[in-house]
């Protein structure tokens, strides 16, 4: 980049100098034209082609004809041209010739001095001179102008040459600087290459040293291997001889053993032929004695085991008998507790329902009318009252509304005839409290939404001994509602797991289940003021509800 810039600067300087020289020459040429006295007609015809060729000054000089000043000017032009060419060759041989030097070059002078040009010019001068002649004053002025012009040309040429010289020196300095930079770069590259080659030489020397070490180690290993091979050869030779000696000794031992075995076989055959006659009897007697001993030992063991098992059997029988006694005692106590609970519940039911029969029936009928035959199944609650006094033992059944109003009315009116079971000749006040729970599931298609399970209370008072009372009770159950058990417990305590109850008719002994005894011992509190309605809501799936009927029997035994 720097070299290109320098070249551009040099070209610009040369162009400026050429422009200055050409402008000076143009001005001087115009000055000469002012002092030339020529014919306008002839000069116009001669000067026009000269202007077209760019050689106006030499064409105007033949106007002077055979004037000695013209010859001197031509000689001065030739000398200056020679001086300029010699200086240009010595100063800057590489530079192209200047247009001014081309203007004053020898070829131009040669052309101007050629015979054809001289003849044409002489003809023109003869015509011009024949018409007008130039005065001395004009020649003197022309001489002065030419002197001034030659001196200016000389100074311009010398200044231009000095400029070229300085430019050449600058260009030479720049080239030297570039060459020095290139030389420095090449020297640096060569030094780096020399350093790399030195490092490579060191690496090669190290690798050669390692190779020498490897070669020496391999030679030592080969020598050791040769020694080892020689030792192995000698060892195997000795081992082969040793194995052969051992083989010979082993073969001798085998021959001796074979000889001894053949002798033993012969002796054993002779002994067997002699002893074979008696060994069977001896072995049979020994086996028989051993079998007898084993049988005696086994029989003793079995007798001991039999005695132990018989003792264990007796103990088990005694334990079973004791457990039977405990069971009987427990059953007796449970019977007594059951009877006490039945009596207590019977008395409580008698006091509650003595004066409330008509009120309870009216209450259930009113509830049935309010709910309607097609309404959702919400059962009326049982109104219990504990403030009533104890009256004769006539216990009504707690009734629930059936699927229709007629069925509810019929069941309500049938209380005195079917639900109250009394015996006329009995003076005992014992009663049987039998709640019934229907646990079987029926068809969901025939169940009504309002049908729910209703426990029934049957009271037997003053019954005769040995009399069996059979009561047909119809109940409705709803397995979907979970409040059914709570409402049944609110009335009677618990739901019994059996469908028939055996009652022994004697006062101190009662039969009842454990849950019934617990319910009798801890009865639920019933508030007569609020009526405590034991309502049961219908379950989420009323399809499980079904109307069922069971036949329950109560047997009274003396």
Swiss-Prot record:
Phosphoserine is found on 80, 92, 547
Biological process according to GO: centriole elongation; eye photoreceptor cell development; negative regulation of centriole elongation
Q: Which UniProt keywords apply?
A: Acetylation, Cell cycle, Coiled coil, Cytoplasm, Cytoskeleton, Phosphoprotein, Repeat
The record's disulfide annotation reads none
- Record field: compositional bias (Basic and acidic residues): 1-21
**What positions belong to coiled-coil segments?**
174-199, 299-337
Which ranges does the record mark as transmembrane? Answer: none
Post-translational events? Hyperphosphorylated during recruitment to procentrioles in G2/M phase.
Localisation per UniProt entry: Cytoplasm, Cytoskeleton, Microtubule organizing center, Centrosome; Cytoplasm, Cytoskeleton, Microtubule organizing center, Centrosome, Centriole
What are the Centrin-binding (CBR) repeat spans here? 125-156, 214-245, 246-278
Q: List residues modified as Phosphothreonine.
A: 23
Keyword presence, Acetylation: yes
Residue numbers of N6-acetyllysine PTMs: 521
Q: InterPro entries given for it? A: POC5 (IPR033351)
A Gene Ontology term for the protein's cellular component: cytoplasm
Where is the segment annotated Disordered?
A: 1-25, 360-393
Which family does the similarity line name? Belongs to the POC5 family.
How does this chain assemble? Interacts with CETN2 and CETN3. Forms a microtubule-associated complex with POC1B, CETN2 and FAM161A. Interacts with CCDC15.
Give the protein's biological function: Essential for the assembly of the distal half of centrioles, required for centriole elongation. Acts as a negative regulator of centriole elongation.
Mind telling me what this protein is named?
Centrosomal protein POC5
Q: Which gene encodes it?
A: Poc5
């Amino acid at each position: 980049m720097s070299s290109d810039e320098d070249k551009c600067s040099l070209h610009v300087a040369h162009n400026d100098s050429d422009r200055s020289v050409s402008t000076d020459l143009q001005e001087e040429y115009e000055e000469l034209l002012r002092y030339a006295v020529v014919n306008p007609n002839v000069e116009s015809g001669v000067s026009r082609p000269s202007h077209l060729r760019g050689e106006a000054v030499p064409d105007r000089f033949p106007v002077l004809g055979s004037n000695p000043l013209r010859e001197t000017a031509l000689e001065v032009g030739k000398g200056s041209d020679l001086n300029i060419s010699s200086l240009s060759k010595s100063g800057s041989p590489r530079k192209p010739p200047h247009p001014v030097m081309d203007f004053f070059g020898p070829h131009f002078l040669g052309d101007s001095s050629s015979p054809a040009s001289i003849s044409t010019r002489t003809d023109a001068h003869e015509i011009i001179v024949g018409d007008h002649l130039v005065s001395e004053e004009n020649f003197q002025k022309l001489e002065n102008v030419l002197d001034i012009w030659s001196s200016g040309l000389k100074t311009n040429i010398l200044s231009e040459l000095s400029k070229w010289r300085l430019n050449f020196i600058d260009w030479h300095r720049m080239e030297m600087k570039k060459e020095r930079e290139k030389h420095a770069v090449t020297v640096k590259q060569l030094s780096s290459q020399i350093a790399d080659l030195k490092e490579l030489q060191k690496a090669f020397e190290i690798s050669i040293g390692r190779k020498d070490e490897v070669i020496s180690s391999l030679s030592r290993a080969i020598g050791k291997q040769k020694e080892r091979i020689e030792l192995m050869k000698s060892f195997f030779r000795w081992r082969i001889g040793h194995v052969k000696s051992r083989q010979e000794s082993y073969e001798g031992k085998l021959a001796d053993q074979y000889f001894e075995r053949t002798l033993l076989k012969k002796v054993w055959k002779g002994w067997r032929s002699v002893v074979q006659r008696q060994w069977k009897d001896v072995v049979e007697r020994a086996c028989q004695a051993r079998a007898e001993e084993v049988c005696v030992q086994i029989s003793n063991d079995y007798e001991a085991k039999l005695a132990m098992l018989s003792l264990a059997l007796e103990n088990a029988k005694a334990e079973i008998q004791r457990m039977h006694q405990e069971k009987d005692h427990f059953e007796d106590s449970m019977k007594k507790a059951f009877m006490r609970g039945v009596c207590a519940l019977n008395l409580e039911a008698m006091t509650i329902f003595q004066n409330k029969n008509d009120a309870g029936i009216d209450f259930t009928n009113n509830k049935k009318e309010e709910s309607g035959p097609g309404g959702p199944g919400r059962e009326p609650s049982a109104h219990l009252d504990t403030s009533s006094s104890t009256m004769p033992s006539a216990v009504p059944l707690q009734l629930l509304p059936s699927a229709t109003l007629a069925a509810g009315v019929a069941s309500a009116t049938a209380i005195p005839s079917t639900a109250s079971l009394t015996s006329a000749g009995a003076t005992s006040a014992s009663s049987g409290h039998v709640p019934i729970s229907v646990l079987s599931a029926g068809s969901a298609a025939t169940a009504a939404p309002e049908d729910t399970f209703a426990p029934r209370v049957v009271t037997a008072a003053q019954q005769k001994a040995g009399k069996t009372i059979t009561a047909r009770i119809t109940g409705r159950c709803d397995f979907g509602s979970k409040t059914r058990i709570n409402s049944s417990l609110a009335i009677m305590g618990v739901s019994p797991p059996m469908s028939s109850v055996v009652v022994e008719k004697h006062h101190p002994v009662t039969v009842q289940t454990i849950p019934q005894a617990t319910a009798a011992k801890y009865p639920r509190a019933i508030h007569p003021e609020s009526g405590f309605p034991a309502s049961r809501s219908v379950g989420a799936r009323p399809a499980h509800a079904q109307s069922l009927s069971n036949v329950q029997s109560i047997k009274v035994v003396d």
